[in-house]
Amino acid sequence: MTTELKVMVGIPGSGKSTWVKQEVARIEEEHRTTCVVSRDFVRQSILTDRDSYFDKEVEVFDEFVRQINEAMELGIDVVFADATHISPASRAKLLGRLIADPHTKLTFEVIDVPVETALERNAQRTGVARIPDSAIKKMKKGFSIPTEKEFPKTNWGFSNIEVRVYH
């Protein structure tokens, strides 16, 4: 069986991580293996109490990529890359660093919600998990749904790319 990489796309508070939890449960009922690599969890494991949210971002990104590559190399059936990936540049930055097997399927799972919904959900968060409202509003303005126009001719080495959008 081939690995499927599911790259989450959505602003903070859109419901990406909640969607991932539900999808993991569904996939595991089918007796397939899953691995969720959350950039937030990677960040929490690296940052200290003295650090601010975006401190050590290079180290966080490198570890995020390392964990995704490791899961794909292990042959996990479905690997989730749980982070915002709101722009073509952020998606290309990630995918350009991954070791893609030609048999690996890439799916962009896009969670597109109104900014008001994301702000309401974010207001319920505490500590480092709570993002400034201004940052969420700015990210919503920079948000774009992946399109074939942004894919390189090589498809980053993936055999198949699909985009699914949820509202």
Indicate residue ranges for each PLM-predicted region:
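Flexible, glycine- and charge-enriched loops at secondary-structure boundaries
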Residues: 50, 54-61, 84, 129, ...
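Conserved protein kinase catalytic core
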Residues: 16, 44-47, 88, 118
